[in-house]
């Protein structure tokens, strides 16, 4: 994957894989701080994030600052060798600011103000909020910008987690300004929005409000523009702090912590404004295959900055506190989930939080140091993990090797998930993206993320589960990739509308018509509880939710056909040779086994391997530098797995090789019956992990269940 074109990002000032978590010393008396330092050293903690929610403590009255306690704890951390991910403390406003300016409080779509008492109680468009955010950030930067422990700046916290959209009067003013910048004049807006439907023509900018609750369906282009505007409004808020920090501390890296695959903010835009991508990841312990979705999240995180390492800035040591049922993590789960993030390109394992709270909304959220103190299971397991990470220092700075990318396009996500005016509410963008990635995971591949316009350098296969909104530029980029020998697979309901939600001339697939060699006559949603069947490769696969009546153009091969229902006998899956590559179209929502079958064939056409036998709990990801491949092999399941791995590989965790004796952490490492010097068998016990170092090869090692292997 190519680097981002924004120049060389500033480096985080820490010379190790970062390990630690959020730290809230202002929730504890100072006599606890010394104990924290002792236990942090014992656990191997080398970085903490603070003071994320401490604005009220730092500025208890307007213009009156109390820096003394923060001075003391920052110095104490530095004295103990712990780097500081220093937050700007702008995650939530102090009560005095809200009471002085109640117009700052956000408003929901029903016109109700959200009150003080939780967090993120602000309208992102509020001029007062923006002015105060800039002021507080400058105060923090001027006081601590030269602190020797400062590793990077942490701006705000989880933008949009509670308030990603605001419908208040100040948001309306900002929305109008955004629309004026986009369309120039009312004629441009009226044309883009298609206002002749239902008599919605605007004759004054002041007539345009945020899309509050209305008697019926709201104009879908207005809704789409409000999604874009809301993401941009939050980005502007972020950029205000970035600009202040660039001015005062130009050499210090800046970040804001993302929330994995988060619908409400276009992270491509946010990542371009920061130095390093950071993520808060909370796979559900109650979901036995949550690691599969996590892999897609992490693929996005590493891709947002062109493949550069990212940082896992928050995760849970066990249970969270915000699900309906907060299931704890089983013993060993902390380790395998944390090392999965490292496998996928993270140069950090951080938790929320260091010491478990005694009060407040998160007192039942697990932490590194649980309520029982150093005897707690979470502390013992995270301490062991901290020491284990030191054995993996060689992987720091390396990059994940992937030959496959999945198109992540926020416009299509927003447009295809509007609550009304679509053929079906069941065709969920995120659910389809996760299903396609899950199939590729089963077949043995880690998947990057990419924009629909690329760059596609280094990839053999690009999959686009849905590109509802598509333009000629995207089509040209994908066509050039295929012409040069790439394989692209595009999913249903793609190429339907342009960026103003107007249906393309001639219908779907719009700009992809020539590339795919098909035309969609009609979308054909499947009613709840029903499923069509699709015949593919001699097997029948269920197709719930969605189908399409398509016509193939000359030169297009029918790979699979509908086998039941009203579409029986019509094409369902097609491919077309274009230049040196091929373009596939999947017109239906296939069951998991159907997707595996189709994508297995697409992989073969792209010259990529695929596992013959699949196990959803097996994962293998390779990070590499110029000389060495570091292949992480993970068993996310509760029963042992035996896999085929390169013979003579050095396990960074155990220090052994594939010819060594059994090791209790991983089970047996024994030679297989394969030809000498080729492959060995490795048994991974429950939640087992191996990190195998081998000389860098032209292709990353492809790990399969034993005795299966590729020649």
Label each PLM-derived region with a short phrase.
Residues 205-208, 260, 271, 279-711:
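Carbohydrate-binding surfaces of carbohydrate-active enzymes
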Residues 1-49, 60, 75-79, 83, ...:
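N-terminal carbohydrate-binding accessory modules
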Residues 27-42, 133-139, 259-270, 330-338:
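Short, acidic/polar
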Residues 110, 114-276, 280-294:
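Polysaccharide-binding and catalytic clefts of secreted carbohydrate-active enzymes
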Residues 18-29, 53-68, 115-134, 159-163, ...:
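The substrate-binding groove and active-site-proximal loops of carbohydrate-active enzymes
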Residues 21, 40, 48, 77, ...:
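Conserved, mostly hydrophobic/aromatic
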Residues 14-17, 44-46, 78-84, 146-151, ...:
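Short, well-ordered coil/turn segments that N-cap beta-strands
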Residues 35-41, 49-113, 141, 241-248, ...:
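Aromatic-lined substrate-binding rim segments of carbohydrate-active enzymes
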């Amino acid at each position: 994957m190519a680097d981002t074109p924004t120049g060389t990002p500033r480096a985080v000032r820490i010379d190790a894989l970062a390990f630690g978590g959020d730290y809230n010393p202002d929730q504890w008396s100072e006599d606890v701080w010394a104990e924290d330092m002792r236990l942090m050293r014992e656990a191997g903690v080398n970085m903490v994030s603070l003071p994320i929610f401490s604005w009220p403590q730092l500025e208890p009255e307007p213009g009156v600052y109390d820096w003394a306690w923060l001075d003391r704890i920052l110095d104490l951390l530095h004295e103990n060798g712990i780097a500081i991910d220093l937050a700007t403390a702008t995650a939530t406003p102090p009560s005095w600011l809200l009471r002085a300016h109640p117009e700052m409080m956000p408003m929901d779509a029903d016109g109700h103000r959200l009150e003080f008492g939780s967090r993120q109680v602000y309208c992102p468009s509020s001029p007062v909020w923006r002015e105060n955010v800039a002021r507080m950030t400058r105060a923090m930067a001027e006081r601590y910008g030269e602190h020797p422990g400062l590793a990077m700046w942490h701006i705000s916290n989880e933008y949009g987690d509670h308030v990603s959209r605001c419908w208040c009067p100040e948001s309306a003013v900002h929305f109008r300004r955004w629309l004026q910048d986009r369309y120039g004049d009312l004629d441009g807006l009226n044309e883009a929005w298609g206002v002749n439907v239902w008599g919605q023509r605007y004759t004054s900018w002041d007539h345009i409000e945020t899309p509050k609750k209305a008697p019926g369906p709201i104009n879908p282009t207005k809704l789409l523009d409000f999604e874009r505007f809301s993401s941009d409004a939050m980005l502007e808020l972020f950029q205000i702090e970035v600009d202040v920090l660039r001015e005062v501390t130009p050499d210090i890296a800046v970040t804001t912590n993302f929330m994995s695959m988060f619908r409400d903010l276009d992270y491509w835009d946010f990542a371009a404004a920061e130095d390093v991508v950071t993520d808060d990841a909370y796979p559900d312990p109650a979901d036995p295959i949550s690691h599969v979705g996590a892999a897609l999240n992490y693929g996005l995180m590493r891709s947002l900055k062109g493949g550069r390492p990212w940082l896992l800035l928050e995760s849970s040591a066990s249970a969270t506190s915000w699900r309906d049922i907060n299931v704890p993590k089983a013993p060993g789960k902390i380790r395998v989930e944390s090392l999965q993030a490292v496998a996928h390109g993270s140069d950090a394992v951080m938790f929320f939080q260091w010491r478990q709270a005694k009060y407040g909304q998160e007192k039942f959220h697990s932490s590194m140091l649980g309520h029982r103190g150093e005897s707690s299971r979470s502390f013992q397991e995270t301490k062991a993990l901290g020491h284990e990470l030191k054995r993996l220092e060689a992987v720091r700075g390396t990059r994940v090797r992937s030959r496959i990318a999945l198109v992540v396009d926020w416009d299509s996500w927003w447009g295809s998930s509007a609550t009304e005016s679509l053929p079906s509410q069941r065709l969920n963008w995120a659910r389809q993206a996760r299903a396609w990635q899950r199939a590729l995971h089963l077949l043995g591949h880690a998947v990057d993320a990419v924009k629909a316009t690329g760059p596609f350098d280094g990839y053999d296969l690009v999959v686009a589960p849905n590109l509802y909104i598509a333009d000629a530029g995207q089509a040209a980029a994908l066509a050039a990739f295929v012409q040069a020998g790439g394989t692209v697979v595009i999913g249903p309901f793609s190429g339907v509308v342009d960026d103003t939600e107007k249906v393309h001339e001639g219908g779907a697939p719009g700009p992809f018509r020539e590339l795919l060699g098909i035309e969609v006559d009609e979308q054909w949603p499947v009613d709840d509880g029903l499923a069509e069947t699709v015949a593919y490769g001699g097997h029948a696969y269920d197709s719930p939710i969605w189908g399409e009546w398509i016509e193939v153009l000359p030169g297009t091969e029918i790979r699979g056909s509908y086998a039941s229902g009203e579409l029986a006998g019509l094409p369902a899956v097609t491919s077309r040779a274009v230049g040196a590559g091929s373009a596939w179209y999947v017109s239906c929502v296939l069951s998991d086994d159907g997707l595996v079958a189709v994508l297995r064939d697409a992989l073969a056409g792209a010259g990529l391997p695929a596992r013959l036998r699949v196990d959803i709990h097996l994962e293998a990801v390779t990070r590499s530098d110029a000389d060495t491949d570091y292949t992480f092999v993970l068993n996310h399941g509760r029963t042992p797995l035996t896999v085929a791995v390169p013979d003579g590989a050095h396990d960074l965790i155990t220090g052994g090789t594939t010819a060594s004796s059994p090791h209790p952490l991983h089970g047996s490492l024994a030679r297989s019956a394969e030809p000498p010097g080729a492959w060995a068998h490795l048994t991974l016990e429950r939640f087992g992990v191996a990190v195998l170092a081998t000389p860098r090869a032209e292709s990353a090692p492809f790990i399969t269940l034993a005795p299966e292997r590729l020649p």
